[in-house]
Curated annotation (Swiss-Prot):
Residues 1-38 form a transit peptide. It is an enzyme of class 2 (transferase). It catalyses: L-lysyl-[protein] + 3 S-adenosyl-L-methionine = N(6),N(6),N(6)-trimethyl-L-lysyl-[protein] + 3 S-adenosyl-L-homocysteine + 3 H(+). It comes from Homo sapiens. One of its GO terms (molecular function) is protein-lysine N-methyltransferase activity. Belongs to the methyltransferase superfamily. ETFBKMT family. Gene3D superfamilies: Vaccinia Virus protein VP39. InterPro entries: Ribosomal_L11_MeTrfase_PrmA (IPR050078), SAM-dependent_MTases_sf (IPR029063). Interacts with HSPD1; this protein may possibly be a methylation substrate. This is Electron transfer flavoprotein beta subunit lysine methyltransferase. The lineage of its organism: Eukaryota, Metazoa, Chordata, Craniata, Vertebrata. Keywords: Cytoplasm, Methyltransferase, Mitochondrion, Transferase, Transit peptide.
Length: 262
């Protein structure tokens, strides 16, 4: 089975690394400070070479042509290989998911939402939404993911877009003491009922403790559309997805940015 038809289906239909998400990880780059001496200086050379060889730099086929990303595309070998041949954890970071596309487009079109503010990108993946926040003038950014390879990919993607890399936390942030953020953004995270419940409670605490603004990107997955969080959402903007994204996401045609206010 091709990689694109195996591991990718989990997020679209609800599986996705729950065991890994519930385990603790590590701090790849320190929170609250920017330790880079230069783009890629903290990358393992072998993994960096592997990512550069097995991903494609692209800015087409998404809602944000301004942002270049290293992604897994049909022109990449591992798009077609058996999933078990990929030597690392499943590369969910290598797909630009539709919820993240919508969030990134919204931040680029509305820079006042993040300008001069602190932003947490929860479940950052390829880092596109954090990159959009940086491009739009956010003063402090933390990208969070559970996969160390995602952290390395985010650093490479910052380099592609001529940005100084921002801090990246590789850990299940839901298990940590909450920090104060002006804005929390999360895209494509409501793919499992248990995870959705945990996110809902964490976001409510974040809102009531710090009055943090929360924006959620989702293309209408049933685990999100049918969740009780819907009672606390208002639609901010809806985007039509490009045809290539529709084909890769089970025919989903739009992606929406939602504001959360419990």
């Amino acid at each position: 089975m091709a990689l694109s038809l195996g591991w990718k289906a989990h997020r679209n239909h609800c599986g996705l690394l729950l065991q890994a998400l519930r385990s603790s990880g590590l701090l790849l780059f320190p929170c609250g400070q920017c330790p880079w001496r230069g783009a890629g200086s903290f990358l393992d050379p072998e993994i960096k070479a592997f990512l550069e060889e097995n991903t494609e730099v692209t800015s087409s086929g998404s809602l944000t042509p301004e942002i270049q990303l290293r992604l897994l595309t049909p022109r990449c070998k591992f798009w077609w290989e058996r999933a078990d041949l990929w030597p690392h954890s499943d590369p969910y970071w290598a797909i630009y998911w539709p919820g993240g596309q919508a969030l990134s487009r919204y931040l680029l079109d509305n820079p006042d939402v993040v300008r001069g503010k602190s932003v947490l990108d929860l479940g950052s993946g390829c880092g596109a939404t954090a990159i959009a926040a940086k491009m739009s003038g956010a003063s402090r950014i933390l990208a969070n993911d559970i996969d160390p390879i995602a952290g390395m990919a985010i650093t490479l993607n910052c380099e592609l877009n001529r940005l100084n890399p921002f801090p990246i936390l590789i850990q299940n942030i839901l298990n940590l003491e909450q920090d104060k953020w002006d804005l929390v953004v999360l895209g494509d995270m409501f793919y499992d009922e248990d995870l959705a419940d945990s996110l809902h409670q964490w976001l409510k605490k974040c809102f009531w403790t710090y009055r943090t603004r929360v924006l959620i990107g989702d293309p209408g997955r049933p685990q999100f559309s049918g969740h009780s969080i819907q009672h606390h959402l208002h639609k901010v903007v809806e985007y039509s997805l490009l045809e290539s994204t529709r084909q890769e996401n089970s025919g989903l045609t739009t992606s929406t940015v939602w504001g959360f206010q419990p």
